[in-house]
UniProtKB/Swiss-Prot annotation:
<keyword id="KW-0808">Transferase</keyword>
<keyword id="KW-0489">Methyltransferase</keyword>
<comment type="similarity">
    <text>Belongs to the methyltransferase superfamily. RsmH family.</text>
</comment>
<dbReference type="InterPro" id="IPR029063">
    <property type="entry name" value="SAM-dependent_MTases_sf"/>
</dbReference>
<keyword id="KW-0949">S-adenosyl-L-methionine</keyword>
<dbReference type="Pfam" id="PF01795">
    <property type="entry name" value="Methyltransf_5"/>
</dbReference>
<dbReference type="InterPro" id="IPR002903">
    <property type="entry name" value="RsmH"/>
</dbReference>
<protein>
    <recommendedName>
        <fullName>Probable methyltransferase-like protein 15 homolog</fullName>
        <ecNumber>2.1.1.-</ecNumber>
    </recommendedName>
</protein>
<feature type="binding site">
    <location>
        <position position="74"/>
    </location>
    <ligand>
        <name>S-adenosyl-L-methionine</name>
    </ligand>
</feature>
<dbReference type="InterPro" id="IPR023397">
    <property type="entry name" value="SAM-dep_MeTrfase_MraW_recog"/>
</dbReference>
<dbReference type="GO" id="GO:0071424">
    <property type="term" value="F:rRNA (cytosine-N4-)-methyltransferase activity"/>
</dbReference>
<feature type="binding site">
    <location>
        <position position="133"/>
    </location>
    <ligand>
        <name>S-adenosyl-L-methionine</name>
    </ligand>
</feature>
<dbReference type="GO" id="GO:0070475">
    <property type="term" value="P:rRNA base methylation"/>
</dbReference>
<comment type="function">
    <text>Probable S-adenosyl-L-methionine-dependent methyltransferase.</text>
</comment>
<dbReference type="GO" id="GO:0005759">
    <property type="term" value="C:mitochondrial matrix"/>
</dbReference>
<feature type="binding site">
    <location>
        <position position="103"/>
    </location>
    <ligand>
        <name>S-adenosyl-L-methionine</name>
    </ligand>
</feature>
<feature type="binding site">
    <location>
        <begin position="55"/>
        <end position="57"/>
    </location>
    <ligand>
        <name>S-adenosyl-L-methionine</name>
    </ligand>
</feature>
Length: 356
């Protein structure tokens, strides 16, 4: 029998060799120049890079505006180490402050650094996994690289369940919901049934290759077409769904948008980069003012009847917008950028200014 990979040992090996030089970090920032153009950094301004990754956007911002200051947040310890290394370099010393945590950790970090609400000049979100996370097999995000089925964006820094834990314990009905809600998977029932059968009859699913191979067998093939008619592995949506569930990504995105409204000053600028419709829908509804009780409304505005609401507070929250979008149509990479960096092909950028 093939010996299964040891996730703990591989994770320790990854941590030991994770001292990557920030100048050669394997990440090409998406829509970088456009993002910085919309942020419009000014001397003395304070900015938050909410998803530091390998630091491409932060580097460009600080190069464009040497007298600005950036707080660099990331939940990934490797990204945090890259931010620390960058902050200690002569070029960026005193201008870059690394922060380790999720979006929901920001209020605590804000207090620790003596920052006030309504004081920040700009915030940038580059949602989803970083290239570093996809490229490191030991992180468990990649279909094409075999590794332990982990998928935790924080690398286990704060504990939490792994993707393998989810698949070992989730009920079939709940797995169907996860695949439909977070992966927009039309074959959710078929895949969930097959995964539970494999779990019950064979073994605990512990590696990315095992999961990808099982789904390939369930779907009678390894590829199919995505929404844009591009070839995609039949396990792509399942990987996305489980990753989003493990990391509580959509709730974190929603909370990040709420925090942006609290932290930015009036006329402060927000730039977001999303990579699939679930992320973009949350961002779009916040910017359009379609928010109820601090959360993106489940219904688009065109399906919401304001005339049926008699609660003044709720009506005000629906009609009072906090953002003005800075462009008419969503911004996507041009053909040249997609050719240079294929991972940018599904990116969407939105930029807005805080109005109240």
């Amino acid at each position: 029998m093939k010996r299964l990979l040891n996730p703990t040992r591989l994770r320790l090996d990854w941590l030991r060799r994770s001292s990557i030089d920030v100048t050669t970090a394997p990440h090409v920032p998406v829509l970088c120049d456009t993002a910085i153009e919309y942020l419009q950094p000014v001397p003395g301004g304070t900015y938050f890079d909410m998803t530091f990754g390998a630091g491409g956007h932060t580097r460009r911002l600080l190069e464009k505006c040497p007298e600005a200051k950036v707080y660099a947040l990331d939940r990934d310890p490797l990204a945090h180490q890259l931010a620390r290394d960058m902050s200690e370099s002569e070029e960026f010393k005193g201008r870059l402050i690394p922060l380790l945590g999720k979006f929901s950790d920001l209020p605590k970090l804000f207090k620790e650094h003596g920052l006030a609400k309504n004081s920040v000049d700009g915030m940038l979100f580059d949602f989803g996994c970083s290239s570093m996370q996809f490229d490191e097999a030991v992180r468990g995000f990649s279909i094409s690289r075999d590794g332990p089925l982990d998928m935790r964006m924080d690398g286990g820094h704060s504990g939490g369940v792994t993707a393998a834990d989810v698949l070992a314990n989730v009920e079939e009905g709940d797995l169907v919901k996860i695949l439909r809600m977070y992966g927009e998977e039309k074959a959710a029932k078929k895949i969930a049934r097959g995964l539970v059968d494999a779990r019950n009859a064979l073994f605990k699913i512990e590696t990315t290759k095992q999961l990808a191979d099982i789904i390939e067998n369930i779907m009678d093939g390894g590829t199919r077409k995505d929404k844009l008619r591009r070839p995609a592995h039949s396990a792509t949506k399942t990987f996305q769904a489980i990753r989003i569930f493990v990391n509580n990504e959509l709730n974190e995105i929603n909370y990040g948008m709420v925090l942006a409204n609290e932290i930015l000053r009036v006329d402060g600028r927000l730039v977001t980069i999303t990579f699939h419709s679930l992320e973009d829908t949350i961002v779009k509804r916040h910017i359009n003012g379609n928010v109820l009780a601090g959360a993106a409304n489940a219904l688009p505005l065109k399906y919401s009847s304001h005339y049926a609401i008699d609660e003044p507070d709720i009506l005000e929250s629906l009609t009072k917008k906090s953002w003005k979008q800075l462009h008419r149509h969503v911004i996507v990479p041009d053909a040249d950028e997609v050719a240079r960096n294929t991972r940018s092909r599904s990116a969407k950028l939105r930029a807005a200014v805080k109005t109240n």
